[in-house]
Amino acid sequence: MALFAVFQTTFFLTLLSLRTYQSEVLAERLPLTPVSLKVSTNSTRQSLHLQWTVHNLPYHQELKMVFQIQISRIETSNVIWVGNYSTTVKWNQVLHWSWESELPLECATHFVRIKSLVDDAKFPEPNFWSNWSSWEEVSVQDSTGQDILFVFPKDKLVEEGTNVTICYVSRNIQNNVSCYLEGKQIHGEQLDPHVTAFNLNSVPFIRNKGTNIYCEASQGNVSEGMKGIVLFVSKVLEEPKDFSCETEDFKTLHCTWDPGTDTALGWSKQPSQSYTLFESFSGEKKLCTHKNWCNWQITQDSQETYNFTLIAENYLRKRSVNILFNLTHRVYLMNPFSVNFENVNATNAIMTWKVHSIRNNFTYLCQIELHGEGKMMQYNVSIKVNGEYFLSELEPATEYMARVRCADASHFWKWSEWSGQNFTTLEAAPSEAPDVWRIVSLEPGNHTVTLFWKPLSKLHANGKILFYNVVVENLDKPSSSELHSIPAPANSTKLILDRCSYQICVIANNSVGASPASVIVISADPENKEVEEERIAGTEGGFSLSWKPQPGDVIGYVVDWCDHTQDVLGDFQWKNVGPNTTSTVISTDAFRPGVRYDFRIYGLSTKRIACLLEKKTGYSQELAPSDNPHVLVDTLTSHSFTLSWKDYSTESQPGFIQGYHVYLKSKARQCHPRFEKAVLSDGSECCKYKIDNPEEKALIVDNLKPESFYEFFITPFTSAGEGPSATFTKVTTPDEHSSMLIHILLPMVFCVLLIMVMCYLKSQWIKETCYPDIPDPYKSSILSLIKFKENPHLIIMNVSDCIPDAIEVVSKPEGTKIQFLGTRKSLTETELTKPNYLYLLPTEKNHSGPGPCICFENLTYNQAASDSGSCGHVPVSPKAPSMLGLMTSPENVLKALEKNYMNSLGEIPAGETSLNYVSQLASPMFGDKDSLPTNPVEAPHCSEYKMQMAVSLRLALPPPTENSSLSSITLLDPGEHYC
């Protein structure tokens, strides 16, 4: 015990000595100035790193000290930053501190110094600052190289929205340096003649591969060099959103979150942010490999409460979010499986499913959704392992989609995903009768009934309608009925019935059964045809119809309608109205503007006989007429004309035609009576006349001037406006006297045509009466007296070859001088004082002598020819023949003779009409044409016939030649005879 007391006394004495020493040290106020200050640089982070020590600290003592750091730039007097750094200092400890510079360290020289202050409660007051350490100079420019231009910082990484300072260093102060940010010039502040700094405030994110900044040095127009940097701007790291953890099997926690914007940059400057999951109760940490989810294994140590911290981190910042939860409250079940339907009929079904078991005695809350026919029904049920639910009140022949999902019934967290299946209920017999209506048209001796019915809705059809039964029963003969089966999907049929009353039933059938019958009665009496049609106006909402109630008992009304211009079978509709209703609105999307619709309103008696009550017609919206009438101009006179357009149909127009506008233009620009001035759409003026009666389709425009020019244009109009614009039709009134001339000339022309027709019909009689046919001499029987040699030649006889047996003086023309064509000789007056004859002479060289001669004379032809020497008897001396010149070529004469032999006189060719007088018969004499007998032998009997063809004596013909086959025609002396 005494030893312990001695030891205790010794300890306290030692402690007291130590406190006394400390007090002495403090009393001495030894200086604690920082020493051994060293400054290093980090160009990547653009930071200064300081390290120093503090001398004169007591051995194994710790003191709380404050260090004040001062940083200057370019020169020591330019202090840019002053700050304090507090820490606990140990004996012989090396202290560290870093400072990041906004200006790149390469752009300027920096100076650093430090002083200290003891801030420890163990030291008595007052405390005082130590002396400043000496300035420590930091310069990085010496290590940049020898280029003339530099831009700093290199590849700096900053966050979007921060402020950044860049600079350039130019070795040559004579250079002009321009800097650009993404092609746009920027302006900075000159720090010294070699350095200029640029402050970029709130830099934006442009691209993940960085923002381009470059500077160009030049002297005059000569570029000295270009340098640039890439400034990497990162998106701001966001705090994870919607951080949540849950389990589906109590073995694994599945944590998810929304990572927000990815902060990854190109060139591997910064990867995507990383996520770390830290659980504070267990102290475990896990680096997540996915950016939006992470799994955490649940241990079997019955831990139920978890406190998770999710840390997001990149090179620039960290973000974290925390959740605290109980494991049993975060159960997210797996999907149900094995969904099936049992005992499915037309209206009921049983749905079954299974769930994944996770714990014993676990209760599941399941939700069922049933979708069908546009409706959704929802049911909830609690189960242990297997689920089952009875679905009732279903529609027949309907496809349903049923699905189920489950959750923890004790601590609801969220529903599982859906699991579902489709099923279809069975068909049932149709539950409603078809809606039936009819159109009855009367024909001689029968009714034509067109039945229509609307297809049953899916709700009432209860399946696919296969056919319709139409039963027709004659009410006058109850035992007589007919059954017509109409296959679906037809919705109409046509029946031809006699003039009896009939009851018609329509029944719809599917694979299960038949619907109730829809009954309609066709009366033997015709419908009420005395109902007048009333015009109505529609609106955008449809047609509002009203009618007077039918006297007597009615079970309802039917309103049917159709397009006025189309086939009734293609657009026929009807609507049933209750017995106490006398108005309705017909509204449907099928109504179109400009289309006329006809409505008929029927009342249905208790016997289901329809009676027509009213007819109405109208447009849901009237439009202007779609076309103009084709106008004809009739009865055009000098003072008026009539316009008519009888063929214009008003029924097919897109509105009720209320009348017509007649526009008239004239050069006088004065409107006639009944017309008024109007201005057209093109600004031109004209006269306008309004016809208010749409059935009046003619107009007489009178009080016009003769020989005047007019233009007209007719257009119909409805309540919506006029018809389309068109060109004016031109018309000119005739002269005032032209009609009188027409009245005179037309009868004259008619008379002339009548005479010509009569003459044509009596042409044969006129010919026989006025100019009968002249007999053909070659067909005369006298020719049988003449004997021809083989191959005879037609010749003109010489004068000496024919001795006349009689002389007949035809005429004694006055003495004239005649130029004979063939010989170019003329006859004196003394030579022509006596009658002359023309002789036909033979021209054959082997002519043996005179032969028989036939002379024909016809004084009905050219008198001049007969006077100058026709076929006659002239007292001419045979010893003094006078040759008559050839009047035509021998070839033409021969052709003419041959023609006369073959044809009648009227068939002589046109080329031979130059012959004025040609004998039709020449004796076939043979001999030399040049040898004429001096003593002509008396010719045998010479038959006479009137010469039929005259030859023009005025034609100049060529002289005869030796090769001619015909002799010339000569003029004989008196006493000679010719044939």
UniProtKB/Swiss-Prot annotation:
Compartments annotated for it: namely: Membrane
Give ranges for the Cytoplasmic compartment: 762-979
Question: Record's Gene Ontology CC terms?
Answer: apical plasma membrane; external side of plasma membrane; oncostatin-M receptor complex; plasma membrane; receptor complex
Determine the domain of life of the protein's source.
Eukaryota
List keywords of the entry alphabetically: Amyloidosis, Disease variant, Disulfide bond, Glycoprotein, Membrane, Phosphoprotein, Receptor, Repeat, Signal, Transmembrane, Transmembrane helix
GO biological process terms held by the UniProt record: cytokine-mediated signaling pathway; oncostatin-M-mediated signaling pathway; positive regulation of acute inflammatory response; positive regulation of cell population proliferation; response to cytokine
Which GO molecular function annotations are given, in alphabetical order? ciliary neurotrophic factor receptor binding; cytokine binding; cytokine receptor activity; growth factor binding
SUPFAM superfamilies the record matches: Fibronectin type III
Which residue ranges does the UniProt annotation give for the motif Box 1 motif? 770-778
Query: According to the UniProt record, which cysteines are disulfide-bonded?
Result: C245-C255
Which conditions up-regulate this protein?
Answer: Activated by oncostatin-M. Up-regulated by IFNG/IFN-gamma. Up-regulated by bacterial lipopolysaccharides (LPS). Up-regulated by triacylated lipoprotein (Pam3Cys).
Q: Which residues carry this modification: Phosphoserine?
A: S826, S889
Major site of localization recorded for this protein: membrane
Q: Which residues cross the membrane?
A: 741-761
- Segment forming the signal sequence: 1-27
Name of a matching Pfam family: LIFR_D2
* Topology of the protein relative to the lipid bilayer: Single-pass type I membrane protein
What biological function has been recorded for the protein in this entry?
A: Associates with IL31RA to form the IL31 receptor. Binds IL31 to activate STAT3 and possibly STAT1 and STAT5. Capable of transducing OSM-specific signaling events.
- Family of this protein: Belongs to the type I cytokine receptor family. Type 2 subfamily.
Q: Which disease is it linked to?
A: Amyloidosis, primary localized cutaneous, 1: A primary amyloidosis characterized by localized cutaneous amyloid deposition. This condition usually presents with itching (especially on the lower legs) and visible changes of skin hyperpigmentation and thickening that may be exacerbated by chronic scratching and rubbing. Primary localized cutaneous amyloidosis is often divided into macular and lichen subtypes although many affected individuals often show both variants coexisting.
Mind telling me what this protein is named?
Oncostatin-M-specific receptor subunit beta
| Organismal lineage | Eukaryota, Metazoa, Chordata, Craniata, Vertebrata
Tell me the name of the encoding gene: OSMR
